[in-house]
Amino acid sequence: QGEKNLRELNWAPFPVSPKSVELILVTHAHTDHVGYLPALVRDGFAGEILATQATCELAAIVLRDAAYLAERDAEHAAANGYSKHEQPLPLFTEADAERTIGLFRAIDYDSDIDLGDGWTARWTRAGHILGSASIRVATPSASVVFSGDLGRAEHPVLRAREIPPGDRKSVV
């Protein structure tokens, strides 16, 4: 998906072994936030994927659809000879997507989730899409907030975004 140089990045080796990753925190279910997860699972990731309940449910739909389309695209490329590869492959399969969906664990908004070693994570409503959140990760000595994508302060359909707890010392 996207420009050629970005598509090629999907096929490059991940910078660390996916087997070494223990946990993934997800802000929302748009493809640019969850679409590579099945490739990580295919390559050995077996930890938990934490997200809000709505994000877990939407991600299941998005990933099944993306896998279906990727498999059909590969079949179409093979049948019509427009791939430079002798046997075009999808980035991930429907089986990879199903294994990924099985790793999702739903968490509640505004609850500190123990990540171990004194680290916690807290999801706060982002108002971007159903289930979206900013995630605050805190250690005993510091914290950082990853916003993902933010919605409007006053949204006509979704609950408005909320400000994550904690001090604001730096904004990047």
What are these regions (language model features)?
Residues 1-47, 51-104, 150-161:
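Pre-active-site segment of Zn-dependent metallo-hydrolases
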Residues 21, 46, 141, 166-167:
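A general structural motif
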Residues 106-165:
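Catalytic core of the metallo-beta-lactamase
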Residues 169-172:
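Conserved small/polar residues in nucleotide/adenosyl-binding loops
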